[in-house]
Amino acid sequence: EYLNHRINAPKTTVTVDGYTNDWDDIENTDALFVGSASQAQMTLRAAHDDENVYFLLSRSDYFLQDGDTMTVCIAAGAAADYRVTVGVDGIRSIEYFANGVKQQRLTGGKAAVKVLGTVGNNDDRDEGYVAEIAIPKALVGLTGAKCFKVRPALVNADGSGPIGDTLTGVSAFSTALWPEIVLD
């Protein structure tokens, strides 16, 4: 009942380098979790400063593939959101959706990814990957915001076809039930 309901994002500046040491110094360890549809799982942590919102996405995945992605959906109203998608090579896209339809592709932000394994080699057992992301608040409508709603999602490309996974009981088309991130 209390899992994935809301988390706090402490105010701090994060160096986006793929190392998690900045996050180790933050006493707040609030995270959202996704990981029931396949063996791949992810957590999302958040922080912010005056200019950026930061996300630390940690993915556990035994078989890393190029198609393995993680997406942070940032609500922009009742039926609209910004979708920041990262892969093993960094930011793949930042897109604005309204009523489930892509409206616009945006540029901006930065990501650093640390891969713990061998992408595309299923003969070994990988650990997963970590993505550290900085997105300008102005790019995703968060300038001056005190909180926002978010929906983390992943795609696992193991096996015969990609498997999508997100929070249980939420819709990609309505942000009403998405958990909130409070900007401390």
Residue ranges, per PLM feature:
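Structural preference for beta-rich elements and adjacent junctions enriched in aromatics
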Residues: 1-184
